[in-house]
Regions:
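Structure-specific nucleic-acid interaction/processing domains
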Residues: 2-15, 22-102
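C-terminal single-pass membrane-anchor helix
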Residues: 101-130
Length: 130
């Protein structure tokens, strides 16, 4: 028994794909205590999903397939191959753990850009009035 798992952010983007021949709880404990990914990656994780496979080879193959399909931000480039030509039916992803509430893309803040636009607009109005 093996698993392919993915980390998703609050916008429901796949940000990392991995596989394990261990129990999911053991692998997640490794990730979140002494993980090899950046702190930025781990702090961006909102949900963890997985698919269970019969063999480790199946899980490894599907990891590579999903990395090429989703092109996750935190996977290493050497596992990406734009020339992958197979298409596989995806099993249903099951949720392992939800860490943060997902945000609809329309609800997302524009951050700094919003502040710049508001400041520019206020300045333009001020110039017209005075």
């Amino acid at each position: 028994m093996a698993f392919t798992y993915r980390f998703k952010d609050i916008y429901d983007n796949t940000i990392y794909v991995g596989y394990t021949g261990q129990q999911m709880s053991e692998r997640m404990n490794q990730h979140f205590t002494k993980g090899h990914l950046s702190k930025d990656c781990y702090s961006s994780v909102a949900k963890i999903e997985y698919i269970k496979w019969k063999t480790k080879s199946d899980a490894q193959l599907m990891e590579i397939y999903f990395i090429n399909k989703y092109k996750p931000r935190y996977n290493k480039q050497n596992k990406r191959n734009d020339k992958l030509t197979i298409t596989l039916d995806e099993k249903e992803w099951k949720t392992y753990q939800v860490l943060k509430k997902q945000v609809e893309k329309s609800e997302a803040s524009w951050g700094c850009l919003t502040w710049v636009l508001i400041t520019s607009l206020v300045y333009a109005i001020y110039q017209l009035l005075f």
